[in-house]
From Swiss-Prot:
The lineage of its organism: Bacteria, Pseudomonadati, Pseudomonadota, Alphaproteobacteria, Rickettsiales. ATP binds at A24, M25, S26, G27, G28, V29, D30, S31, L50, G139. One of its GO terms (biological process) is tRNA wobble position uridine thiolation. This is tRNA-specific 2-thiouridylase MnmA. InterPro entries: MnmA-like, MnmA-like_C, MnmA-like_central, MnmA-like_central_sf, Rossmann-like_a/b/a_fold. Pfam families: tRNA_Me_trans (PF03054), tRNA_Me_trans_C (PF20258), tRNA_Me_trans_M (PF20259).
Length: 367
């Protein structure tokens, strides 16, 4: 069966037996298979799991106490070493606090991107280097190709599981050290391989939720920072007061359900104003836009975005199939994106990820 899972050498001109690989093991099936496969192929595998928070509920997240035990069991059954590193303090300070800050600013965060950006691909990558390992491997569904001293990043062959959207902030320097061996395979086959290896996580469900949110994100914010949940007005697009809300952290742009207003026509959240603590609602027509601005851009091409604009495809959320657009650079690592064929809900705090076909070019945060 292993003949169906051939991968390119992780390090050029270096045999598997002389290549030390750190695999970031979340306790899920994907990273477990990545570690097991590389071990079977002869690589010197070291499994590392990051203890990010204390959660034993097992409610569809990752990197909690139960997941750590799952990863440890996989490593033990396959016969390679495994270590757990406690990153709870860094995770709380840089991911959870950022998550709350973003909501209180009237934006909708993506904590998984932030975790990849500052915990896995910064701190863990540095730890990997300090161990003398050759590469850091993850179970993400994304493809990376190095050719002519340039790095190309592509969507996964399994488009339903593609995770390139969540890795847009990964820098070229980080990508040089990272490997994604599952990018050319489909999830169904990865589960078959997990069964072939007799891994205890072979039937484990995919993580669906934000890992540290065991109830709802609203209750999580109310518990961790209750002073941020303040009552305020719900207004229409003309500024008329329609009702009262229990905190702007309970709303996201584009939200329709749970607004708490009775109306003949559907109402959507069109704006969140943290300065006045107001939630603006209106018809869907007031929500759709074809122009957006992004900041903190991570650009993977050697050539910068031309001032005349670049024709691209953009994804404004992970499930978005993509829209044709033109991106124009601005000062201070910002850009303007003009959608060409459609109007979309533009949600500040989310990511706008830029593609040329299935090649990811980079992206930025919607502001």
């Amino acid at each position: 069966m292993l003949d169906d899972f051939k991968i390119d050498p992780l390090v050029k001109n270096k045999s598997p037996s002389s290549t030390t690989v750190v695999v970031a093991m979340s306790g899920g099936v994907d990273s477990s298979v990545a570690a097991a496969l590389l071990h079977k192929l002869g690589y010197k595998v070291i499994g590392i799991t990051l203890q990010l928070y204390n959660n034993t509920s097992g409610k569809g997240g990752c990197c909690g106490s139960t997941d750590t035990q799952d990863a440890k069991q996989v490593a033990s059954s396959m016969g390679f070493p495994h270590y757990t590193l406690n990153y709870e303090k860094a995770f709380r300070e840089e991911v959870i606090e950022n998550f709350i800050d973003t909501y209180t600013q009237g934006k909708t965060p993506i904590p998984c991107v932030k975790c990849n950006q500052v915990i896995k691909f910064r701190d863990l990558l540095n730890t990997t280097k300090s161990l003398g390992a050759d590469v850091l491997v993850t179970g993400h569904y994304i493809r990376k190709v190095e050719q002519d001293d340039e790095i190309y990043v592509y969507s996964s062959k399994d488009t339903k599981k593609d995770q390139s959207y969540f890795l847009f902030a990964t820098t070229i320097e980080q990508l040089k050290f990272l490997r994604f061996p599952l990018g050319n395979f489909h999830k169904d086959n990865i589960r078959k391989l997990a069964k072939y290896f007799n891994l205890s996580v072979a039937a484990k469900p995919d993580s669906q939720n934000i890992c540290f949110v065991t109830d709802t994100y609203k209750n999580t914010i109310a518990h961790l920072r209750p002073q941020t949940v303040k009552k305020g007005h719900i207004i229409d697009t003309n500024g008329n007061i329609l009702g009262e809300h229990n905190g702007i952290v309970n709303f996201t742009i584009g939200q329709r359900r749970g607004i708490g207003l009775a109306s003949k026509e559907p109402l959507y959240v069109t704006k969140l104003n943290p300065d006045t603590n107001e939630v603006t609602v209106g018809p869907k027509s007031a929500l759709l836009q074809n122009k957006l601005h992004i900041e903190d851009i991570n650009w993977l091409l050697k050539d910068k975005i031309p001032y005349s604009g670049l024709s691209v495809k953009v994804k404004l959320r992970s499930s978005h199939s993509g829209s044709t657009a033109i991106i124009y650079p601005n000062d201070m690592n910002k850009a303007t994106v003009i959608l060409q064929d459609t109007y979309c809900t533009v949600t500040p705090g989310q990511a706008c990820v830029v593609y040329d076909g299935d090649r990811m070019l980079g992206g930025g945060w919607i502001c």
